[in-house]
Amino acid sequence: MSVDPACPQSLPCFEASDCKESSPMPVICGPEENYPSLQMSSAEMPHTETVSPLPSSMDLLIQDSPDSSTSPKGKQPTSAENSVTKKEDKVPVKKQKTRTVFSSTQLCVLNDRFQRQKYLSLQQMQELSNILNLSYKQVKTWFQNQRMKSKRWQKNNWPKNSNGVTQKASAPTYPSLYSSYHQGCLVNPTGNLPMWSNQTWNNSTWSNQTQNIQSWSNHSWNTQTWCTQSWNNQAWNSPFYNCGEESLQSCMQFQPNSPASDLEAALEAAGEGLNVIQQTARYFSTPQTMDLFLNYSTNMQPEDM
């Protein structure tokens, strides 16, 4: 076990001694030892040279591939252009429509019929087309176009006409009547006619007032009320009437069963009062006073009552 580690230690010393003694040997040995590596490198160089063309070919393939990819792209625009040209060739064919030129007589007949009837049935269109020497489709399209034109014209001119119609058709406004009167008569402050007709004649206060007028007319022609009101009115409380009031009251105090002598004595005591009463009775018995009472009762207002 002790000999084995000693051997490697002695060997480097021997090698070192050999190297010291022969100095040029390492110079020779160096290339000899490096030669196989050079050979290996030279052997590897052909291999690398043989391998290097492969990447170059791949590079060429990669470089060629974009060219191949771009080449169809260059062809695609041509196909698109061809398709566009084909579409352009087809579009004018679709737009080419034969426009029928109507004569003046045909237009007059069509317009006249359109004014009378905007929608025609199948038989009517066929009859009209036979009369005008036109096809059914031509008559149908003309009526459709004419209806569209009329609708467009109405739509454009409708606001102007509608404003004029509303201004003409609006009911005239009337001022409010009897503004200072009772609220029952203030039926329509704004003065619109339909509101006036609905509320005036259906109002309870108006009917009550008419009933009061009827009661007033009956009351004025009633004999009892007319006598009491005419005698109790302030207009008849004149000094001429008051002069015989005491004598009249003294006469009214006696009963109807009293003897005539007592009545004559009382009348003589009254003196001139009796003459005044007789004169007033004669005055009120004349037809002129009756007419005066009637005129007064009819001309009296409710406030006097």
Swiss-Prot record:
It holds the Pfam family Homeodomain. Sequence repeats lie at residues 196-200, 201-205, 206-210, 216-220, 221-225, 226-230, 231-235, 236-240. Residues 196-240 are annotated as: 8 X repeats starting with a Trp in each unit. GO terms for biological process: cell differentiation; regulation of transcription by RNA polymerase II; stem cell population maintenance. One of its GO terms (molecular function) is DNA-binding transcription factor activity, RNA polymerase II-specific. Residues 1-96 are annotated as: Disordered. Residues 122-151 are annotated as: Required for DNA-binding. One of its GO terms (cellular component) is nucleus. Residues 65-83 have a biased composition (Polar residues). Residues 241-305 are annotated as: Sufficient for strong transactivation activity. It is found in: Nucleus. Transmembrane segments: none annotated. Keywords: Activator, Developmental protein, DNA-binding, Homeobox, Nucleus, Repeat, Repressor, Transcription, Transcription regulation. PANTHER family: HOMEOBOX PROTEIN (PTHR24327), HOMEOBOX PROTEIN NANOG-RELATED (PTHR24327:SF79). Belongs to the Nanog homeobox family. Transcription regulator involved in inner cell mass and embryonic stem (ES) cells proliferation and self-renewal. Imposes pluripotency on ES cells and prevents their differentiation towards extraembryonic endoderm and trophectoderm lineages. Blocks bone morphogenetic protein-induced mesoderm differentiation of ES cells by physically interacting with SMAD1 and interfering with the recruitment of coactivators to the active SMAD transcriptional complexes. Acts as a transcriptional activator or repressor. Exists an other tandem duplicated non-processed pseudogene (NANOGP1) and 9 other NANOG-related nucleotide sequences located on different chromosomes, all of which are processed pseudogenes lacking introns (NANOGP1 to NANOGP11); except NANOGP8 which is absent from the chimpanzee genome. Interacts with SMAD1. Interacts with SALL4. Interacts with ZNF281/ZFP281. Interacts with PCGF1. Interacts with ESRRB; reciprocally modulates their transcriptional activities. Interacts with NSD2. This is Homeobox protein NANOG. It comes from Pan troglodytes.
